């Protein structure tokens, strides 16, 4: 038995295919979803989506949004998403270093909050790459 997974951003469909299982980062922690999962709607945190296709696991960096799960269908609507295999490792590492530097020199609450969010996004992209290597 499989699940139909659809990952959408405002600009494109990132994934629309059948999967065996997913592990999703939510605002209250990670959840695993298998066929016949109880229906839920949940907020999606900045984090990694792990997708199992038979014996292979793929990763995707998700940048926050929400998910609806029910009737063996999963719809994830996020601000942005990238497959781990599509992320340039050098660019992601450089973005992480820039985000860390920006956090160190942030002044005031607003800059600190924005720098922390940028750092979380950059770390998630690097984690998505490292999870597949």
Swiss-Prot record:
GO terms for biological process: proton motive force-driven ATP synthesis. Keywords: ATP synthesis, CF(1), Chloroplast, Hydrogen ion transport, Ion transport, Membrane, Plastid, Thylakoid, Transport. It comes from the Eukaryota. Pfam families: ATP-synt_DE, ATP-synt_DE_N. InterPro entries: ATP_synth_F1_dsu/esu (IPR001469), ATP_synth_F1_dsu/esu_N (IPR020546), ATP_synth_F1_esu_C (IPR020547), ATPsynth_dsu/esu_N (IPR036771). Its main location: plastid. The keyword Mitochondrion does not apply. It is found in: Plastid, Chloroplast thylakoid membrane. It is a peripheral membrane protein. Gene3D superfamilies: 6.10.140.480, F0F1 ATP synthase delta/epsilon subunit, N-terminal. GO terms for cellular component: chloroplast thylakoid membrane; proton-transporting ATP synthase complex. One of its GO terms (molecular function) is ATP binding. The keyword Secreted does not apply. PANTHER family: ATP SYNTHASE DELTA/EPSILON CHAIN, ATP SYNTHASE EPSILON CHAIN, CHLOROPLASTIC. F-type ATPases have 2 components, CF(1) - the catalytic core - and CF(0) - the membrane proton channel. CF(1) has five subunits: alpha(3), beta(3), gamma(1), delta(1), epsilon(1). CF(0) has three main subunits: a, b and c. Belongs to the ATPase epsilon chain family. Produces ATP from ADP in the presence of a proton gradient across the membrane. This is ATP synthase epsilon chain, chloroplastic. It comes from Gossypium hirsutum.
């Amino acid at each position: 038995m499989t699940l139909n997974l659809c990952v959408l951003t405002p600009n494109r469909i990132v994934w629309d295919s059948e999967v065996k299982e997913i592990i999703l980062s939510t605002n209250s922690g990670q959840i695993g979803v298998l066929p016949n999962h109880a229906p839920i709607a949940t907020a999606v945190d900045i984090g990694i989506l792990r997708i199992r296709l038979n014996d292979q696991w793929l990763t995707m960096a998700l940048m926050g949004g929400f998910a609806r799960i029910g009737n063996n269908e999963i719809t994830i609507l996020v601000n942005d998403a990238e497959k781990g295999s599509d992320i340039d490792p050098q660019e992601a590492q450089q973005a992480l270093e820039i985000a860390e530097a920006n956090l160190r020199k942030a002044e005031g609450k607003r800059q600190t909050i924005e720098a922390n969010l940028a750092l979380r996004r950059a770390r998630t992209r690097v984690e998505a790459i490292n999870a597949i290597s």
